[in-house]
Amino acid sequence: MDIKSFLYQFCAKSQIEPKFDIRQTGPKNRQRFLCEVRVEPNTYIGVGNSTNKKDAEKNACRDFVNYLVRVGKLNTNDVPADAGASGGGPRTGLEGAGMAGGSGQQKRVFDGQSGPQDLGEAYRPLNHDGGDGGNRYSVIDRIQEQRDMNEAEAFDVNAAIHGNWTIENAKERLNIYKQTNNIRDDYKYTPVGPEHARSFLAELSIYVPALNRTVTARESGSNKKSASKSCALSLVRQLFHLNVIEPFSGTLKKKKDEQLKPYPVKLSPNLINKIDEVIKGLDLPVVNPRNIKIELDGPPIPLIVNLSRIDSSQQDGEKRQESSVIPWAPPQANWNTWHACNIDEGELATTSIDDLSMDYERSLRDRRQNDNEYRQFLEFREKLPIAAMRSEILTAINDNPVVIIRGNTGCGKTTQIAQYILDDYICSGQGGYANIYVTQPRRISAISVAERVARERCEQLGDTVGYSVRFESVFPRPYGAILFCTVGVLLRKLEAGLRGVSHIIVDEIHERDVNSDFLLVILRDMVDTYPDLHVILMSATIDTTKFSKYFGICPVLEVPGRAFPVQQFFLEDIIQMTDFVPSAESRRKRKEVEDEEQLLSEDKDEAEINYNKVCEDKYSQKTRNAMAMLSESDVSFELLEALLMHIKSKNIPGAILVFLPGWNLIFALMKFLQNTNIFGDTSQYQILPCHSQIPRDEQRKVFEPVPEGVTKIILSTNIAETSITIDDIVFVIDICKARMKLFTSHNNLTSYATVWASKTNLEQRKGRAGRVRPGFCFTLCSRARFQALEDNLTPEMFRTPLHEMALTIKLLRLGSIHHFLSKALEPPPVDAVIEAEVLLREMRCLDANDELTPLGRLLARLPIEPRLGKMMVLGAVFGCADLMAIMASYSSTFSEVFSLDIGQRRLANHQKALSGTKCSDHVAMIVASQMWRREKQRGEHMEARFCDWKGLQMSTMNVIWDAKQQLLDLLQQAGFPEECMISHEVDERIDGDDPVLDVSLALLCLGLYPNICVHKEKRKVLTTESKAALLHKTSVNCSNLAVTFPYPFFVFGEKIRTRAVSCKQLSMVSPLQVILFGSRKIDLAANNIVRVDNWLNFDIEPELAAKIGALKPALEDLITVACDNPSDILRLEEPYAQLVKVVKDLCVKSAGDFGLQRESGILPHQSRQFSDGGGPPKRGRFETGRFTNSSFGRRGNGRTFGGGYGNNGGGYGNNGGGYGNIGGGYGNNAGGYGNNGGYGNNGGGYRNNGGGYGNNGGGYGNKRGGFGDSFESNRGSGGGFRNGDQGGRWGNF
């Protein structure tokens, strides 16, 4: 009897029939079939993944039968011989634990604590019994009632789903509640960010007697008042959802925001006729404004159907899933756990695990006896502090499902624990039953640790050790192996279950990133269900009590460290020892920055202590004065240079590690140091960046020794804080900052801020010194500031939107979203969870039963924000998936595309001009990416030179490109045809409509919603509800001069919170693009004004606005059609095909300009006048086969010497001569960047000494393209490649 027949026979005894689900998976060139078999009431899912359907079914049945054997429902002897049934490895010390739903008595690991089926205490409302179903009404179903009450007045984007409690009325209600219950607790404020970018975190915890527990809220704001109001709002909304307080019953007051002047929009009669035909063809309902009477002060009337309601087609959704657990099985024959598929061919397809284990044992014994190199590494490993505890650690792991190991960085826990487990299994003849996942918080640590462990085992990667990170994997053998991976990669793998895994090691659990906290909830439920799975949690030396308690008071093992003493110096010590005084120039620049940031400060009276002015009397007056001159907000490169000179004077060998908060500062400091005479000398100093996005070959350099007499200076983010260990560090310089993501739910503000790191962070960084000898730590904050720092930063789960995590919860079949998150180590506020659920319903990712729709399932598998994923789906429908993929990658990558030279605060004109007349950071990025890709294909050297010339961040370009390719691959795997992903070349020189680019920019409004702003003047813009903000200085649209744009509307990617909010990654969009894709509400207000989302006013015929609004639900239906049958999008039914055509017409930038005269605008790269720089630049020319000084003048933005891409819009040369009329430009005469090859007329370098493309160069010349000669006396000075290529590889980008 075959295994499938056997399973049917077994199920027939209980009158149950197995249910099979088979689907294709994998890319087209490696097509496989995934079969899942379910047998109720068991929630375990048997899986087979093979190259044909028959084998997939057979293997799925075998997997399920193996499960039945493990839980004791079947005896091994009863199973047919060909089934190969096995309960797993011989180490099953806790036999008999069954899957929830099995008939046997399940053994609970966490006695007396909540298990997988129980709702966490944090979300149990008043009068709730603890089960899951009892609070469905209070959490979701009364939301629609609240929405119906005041739909027209819900100007707060979320008020209607939270009992109409808003930022304006919540604080008063909270005060009443506190007085009634005699609560005297008050807000605790924590300053976030440096002085000029100050914001505040407000936290308040109140004990709620009715619930017998404490409810906490943490929210941020630009000042204390704003933060406290947001905090009160979160608390009141939580109390509402917990049935403690009532909904708001008063009248919501509409704030008197700045009223925007209606913007005129008019369409051609031909286009209006096309819209009418589509409406008729799809039978779309249209609101008739002529039947509507608007009172002068009355509320506006909706012109479209409410998109937030679930339509009737979704009412019959999938059956609501019960809370479940990720399926797990120990290593078993014929299964490759790393690829989550069956082994269909080759020797391993038929070899038993016991036979493999014997081979592994013989091999290891032989190596220990005969391999001298292996024995040397063993001796080294025996000297690590953790080696003394090897036996104790292994005993604890074997005897307990969960163990916490706490130890100093460098004690050896990251590299040794997994090896101890694997070697112990191998030596006992069970090596094939050990498959170990080790998670790391970052890709660089996963790769570097894997390489280190493989080296210690004298193996190549891919033998017993491998790694898997985004974009790159080297998998080990299927049995008896260790895989290092990021937490995100492991979470992605969980969709297929965790079959074939014996141990999961989670490193750096103290970092509390959102993925790690998410994984802990999953592992806690898995261990409670499968006690044979072993989980090891590893942490640095911080308090692990919370983690131990969460896992049922699991054992905690302390590993002693091995470090030399580290002497710490604070800012006042450093200034005194270096005798540092800030230069007049740096003081002037500081004042400029402070004046600019005060432009839109929300609270000009918010006084905050400048701790640089707090200095003890024991320091000299000169030191105190110098400290007071330094801003806490900025990193003084002058001070860093003085400190490095001081270290140099000590003549103490050892590497220097500098902690910086982000790539932009790393790059700027690297360029600064390379341009100094001392630190730019590569014979004395090697300056290396350490960042997760740089190429692997460059990452490795930080670990490599340098020649004698050379000092290694490593510029790193907090990646070097705990994730990696660099042995030769003696000096640590700590800027004391970190980059943090902040989220305020009531106004949907996600922002990024550079904040003060916590004391725990600083202690970890200090510990990186002193690995090989006594060390030194230079902490660049005052002692007073250090004392004021928080002990720990807020966990990321409290400051990030939850809808991405919610999608993953549903994809992994973990039950309801709020149920799962209620079991987190520190559950996020219940109001944030509800908002995530409601948002996913509105996006049609969830059906009426809160289960994934086809769209939701697709978006859950895309590693980008769900709105961006939805944008990509429509991009595929409109045939521009390639452009949408690169835009989505750019919006998901928060590193800068362009680099700025020292002292340069805005982009150069030649960088701004990459967007042409499109006024778009996204277009500039696309053009730069396409140019970069062409150079990359010519070789690494040409790529590096090109990036240096254009001022591009080469690492960012690589990441964006890799992410784009991954997104397109995932779309293909989902079934979307390749024809919709054809590459589209963007030519920024074209002044006019580009239909493909126009529809792509329109779709950005959908992907980045609600991030719409309106330009007012200079840098000032208005965002949602007319809140003032600034254009970010790194935007191509930023200028400190008077500029106007063809349209004032912009879509932006992210917000940076300072005293004002700055908008980054901006693209100009047309009014029709905003109405069609950048809105949720279209209303008719008084005086026939059409109002979008309660703040954008348009002068457009109301009937026409209603017709355009009628297309929006049709577009939602089109997305549903595309996700149901992706392969059919090239053969849409005629009505939908006509819809696509008319939407493309509406997205053309000029579509709303019929009969209207609009200003063409004065764009930022065109705004400089000749008088600004003393006349136009000279026409470009060649000199002895090389460019003259200005060449393409990367540093020349024309401010001082004129230049730029032609002050009168001459672009790249009016006569089409490539990148400039004279000299052949970009390959005019078959010669690279010059006339006869290479980068000059006769292949000659970049000026005589390779000195870059000009220091103060004037861009592309005035009207004819040219190369602009700007300032001959500076020829050859500074910048670019120093002395050929000796400025260090990283100077190239």
UniProtKB/Swiss-Prot annotation:
Organism: Drosophila melanogaster (Fruit fly)
Sequence repeats by residue range: 1202-1208, 1209-1215, 1216-1222, 1223-1229, 1230-1236, 1237-1243, 1244-1250, 1251-1257, 1258-1263
SMART domains in alphabetical order: DEXDc (SM00487), DSRM (SM00358), HA2 (SM00847), HELICc (SM00490)
GO molecular function: 3'-5' DNA helicase activity; 3'-5' DNA/RNA helicase activity; 3'-5' RNA helicase activity; ATP binding; ATP hydrolysis activity; chromatin binding; DNA helicase activity; double-stranded DNA binding
GO cellular component, one term: chromatin
UniProt keyword Iron present: no
Result for mutant: residue 195 to A: Slightly increased binding to roX2 non-coding RNA
Residue positions binding Mg(2+): 414, 507-508
Catalysed reaction equations from the record: ATP + H2O = ADP + phosphate + H(+)
Recorded consequence of changing residue 196 to E: Decreased binding to roX2 non-coding RNA, leading to decreased localization to male X chromosome
GO biological process, one term: regulation of mRNA processing
UniProt enzyme class: hydrolase
Domain Helicase C-terminal: 639-813
Record family assignment: Belongs to the DEAD box helicase family. DEAH subfamily.
Subcellular location, record wording: Nucleus; Chromosome
Classification via PROSITE patterns: DEAH_ATP_HELICASE, DS_RBD, HELICASE_ATP_BIND_1, HELICASE_CTER
PANTHER family xref list: ATP-DEPENDENT RNA HELICASE (PTHR18934), ATP-DEPENDENT RNA HELICASE A (PTHR18934:SF119)
Record's protein name: Dosage compensation regulator mle
Residue spans of biased composition, Gly residues class: 85-104, 1276-1293
